[in-house]
């Protein structure tokens, strides 16, 4: 019996392709060196004289929208309408002592650093009108007049908080 040379390919070998088949070498492409020209970079040099720095003392900031003046009831309702349009679940949270991030039990960020506030009642699943949220906000303000109160928009599909802003602050803040 005559032996047949081992020319039968396995399935894995039959599907293999040589790497980079048909690519041209870099020598075929022209290379141009660009000179770094910094004369066309944007500049705000003329406007620096008009800029101001936000005073850091006595003006603590909280989170989204906190650099704006206090929002009116109608502005708050528009923000709530925005989160409802995005199909986020409104929630109210309040804090009685520390409206700012603080470190009480550890130096590193964690659960007890002032970012987690007490939730007012339950998340408002099924809420379709900003008036419902504003009514709950008024109830919370009536119950805790010296509390920081914020409104949160929670995406229950992605399980993330998408928006959070201060709705009410104690007097003097």
Swiss-Prot record:
Q: Where is the transit peptide?
A: 1-49
Q: Which GO terms describe its molecular function?
A: ribulose-bisphosphate carboxylase activity
Q: Name one Pfam family in it.
A: RbcS
Gene3D superfamilies cross-referenced by the UniProt entry: Ribulose bisphosphate carboxylase, small subunit
Question: Among the record's GO biological process terms, what is one?
Answer: photorespiration
> Which SMART domains does this UniProt record tie to the protein?
RuBisCO_small
Q: Which InterPro entries match?
A: RuBisCO_ssu (IPR024681), RuBisCO_ssu_dom (IPR000894), RuBisCO_ssu_N (IPR024680), RuBisCO_ssu_sf (IPR036385)
What UniProt keywords are attached to this protein's entry? Calvin cycle, Carbon dioxide fixation, Chloroplast, Photorespiration, Photosynthesis, Plastid, Transit peptide
- Subcellular location, record wording: Plastid, Chloroplast
Disulfide pairings: none
> What positions belong to coiled-coil segments?
none
Q: Does the keyword Chloroplast apply?
A: yes
This protein's GO CC annotations: chloroplast
Q: Has UniProt tagged this entry with the keyword GTP-binding?
A: no
Family that this chain belongs to: Belongs to the RuBisCO small chain family.
Q: PANTHER family attached here?
A: RIBULOSE BISPHOSPHATE CARBOXYLASE SMALL CHAIN 1, CHLOROPLASTIC (PTHR31262), RIBULOSE BISPHOSPHATE CARBOXYLASE SMALL SUBUNIT 1A, CHLOROPLASTIC-RELATED (PTHR31262:SF10)
* Job of this protein: RuBisCO catalyzes two reactions: the carboxylation of D-ribulose 1,5-bisphosphate, the primary event in carbon dioxide fixation, as well as the oxidative fragmentation of the pentose substrate. Both reactions occur simultaneously and in competition at the same active site. Although the small subunit is not catalytic it is essential for maximal activity.
Q: What else is known?
A: The basic functional RuBisCO is composed of a large chain homodimer in a 'head-to-tail' conformation. In form I RuBisCO this homodimer is arranged in a barrel-like tetramer with the small subunits forming a tetrameric 'cap' on each end of the 'barrel'.
Its assembly, as annotated, is: Heterohexadecamer of 8 large and 8 small subunits.
Q: What is this protein called?
A: Ribulose bisphosphate carboxylase small subunit, chloroplastic 3
